[in-house]
Regions:
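Membrane-embedded beta-strand positions of outer-membrane beta-barrel proteins
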Residues: 25-27, 62-66, 112-114, 154-158, ...
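Outer-membrane beta-barrel translocator/channel fold
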Residues: 66-94, 190-274, 280, 284-287
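Transmembrane beta-barrel domains of bacterial outer-membrane proteins
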Residues: 20-126, 132-138, 178
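Transmembrane beta-strands of outer-membrane beta-barrel pores
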Residues: 29-35, 66-74, 116-122, 141, ...
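Outer-membrane beta-barrel "beta-signal"
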Residues: 174-176, 281-295
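Repeated loop/turn-to-beta-strand initiation elements of outer-membrane beta-barrel proteins
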Residues: 56-62, 107-110, 144-154, 182-185, ...
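Short sequence motifs at beta-strands and strand-loop junctions characteristic
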Residues: 38-42, 86-92, 127-131, 148, ...
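Outer-membrane beta-barrel strand-turn architecture
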Residues: 52-58, 102-106, 143-148, 179, ...
Length: 295
């Protein structure tokens, strides 16, 4: 029963634009000390998801989820006239969503999810541009517990959000494979990795990975820079690095990642996705650590 509940939560959160997450609960902290700059970014994140079974067999399950992120932006480099540093020093993302997962046939499940989130500096009362709406559909072929020598899982889906400048759904695909008793790999976006367990009981693991991270927030008091209006602040960063995981139980673990960016774009934009001012673009180190309960 517990495994079915965990699996249903997993598939509902697995297909978001932000992560291929299999988390049920997570608390983490991230820090970026920008290279060739005195600027830095820190982020706190907390996540919780709750299953609501609709039948005894657990073939139909509702899932409710909540996530909060706070991004602290410390800008010490010189900035152009009109750039109000205080307006972007603290950014918030508050997400709530609900989904429905049902079993189609053995080893196959389908799901839908809809949500709303606030992405804003929250300088005042909420405005229309602070709100973003999301929707996802997906199919899961899960063979992790099947009688196969190399367990695997496929996830296919489409994800749509009303993020400014993105008026089309994104296709999503994820493939997980256990190819040796102590080795697994995942292919997909935003994360591709190879994991090696350091001991037979799978208590400790190292992984090498490439991943994508980002954040976005509406600026309630738009800034005028060189005669152009900056309406939001965002960052997109592609990373490659190493991670360590310690499993307290099969599903509860501590993790720490040390990476370096391959591509980095931290900027102010308007709602047509035109760059107004680039804050940092040099490749840099990136650190993230936390505790999570996962499927």
């Amino acid at each position: 029963m517990i495994n079915k509940l965990i699996f249903s939560i997993t598939v509902l959160f697995a297909l978001t634009a932000q992560a291929q997450s299999t988390d049920i609960a997570r608390v983490e902290y991230m820090r970026i000390p920008f290279s060739n700059s005195d600027n830095s970014v820190g982020r706190f994140r907390a996540l919780l998801q709750v299953p609501i079974p609709l039948d005894k067999e657990l073939n139909k399950i509702l899932v409710a989820g909540f996530e909060y992120r706070n991004v602290n932006v410390d800008i010490k480099d010189a900035v152009p006239a009109g750039f109000n540093i205080q307006d972007v020093s603290s950014l918030h993302r508050i997400s709530a969503y609900a989904g429905y997962v049902w079993k189609f046939k053995e080893n196959w499940r389908f799901g839908v999810k809809a949500g709303v989130r606030i992405n804003s500096n929250l300088a005042g009362s909420l405005v229309a541009d602070d709100w973003i709406y999301t929707a996802s559909v997906y199919a899961i072929n899960d063979m992790k517990d099947a009688s196969t020598t190399k367990p695997y899982r496929w996830i296919f889906g489409l994800d749509y959000s009303t993020t400014p400048g993105r008026n089309f759904p994104l296709p999503l695909i994820n493939y997980y494979r256990e190819f040796h008793p102590n080795w697994t790999y995942t292919l997909g976006v935003p994360k591709t990795n190879v994991r090696h367990y350091l001991n037979g009981n799978h208590k400790d693991a190292l992984q090498a990975f490439v991943t994508l991270d980002n954040f976005f927030a509406n600026i309630q008091n738009n800034m005028s820079i060189d005669g152009r209006s900056a309406e939001n602040i965002s960052m997109t960063i592609i990373l490659g690095g190493l991670g360590y995981e310690h499993f307290f139980t099969k599903h509860l673990l501590y993790y720490a990642y040390a990476t370096h960016s391959i591509s980095n774009d931290f900027r102010l934009r308007n709602n047509d996705r035109d760059d107004i001012y680039t804050i940092n673009s040099d490749n840099t180190f990136y650190f993230r650590t936390g505790v999570k309960f996962k499927f």
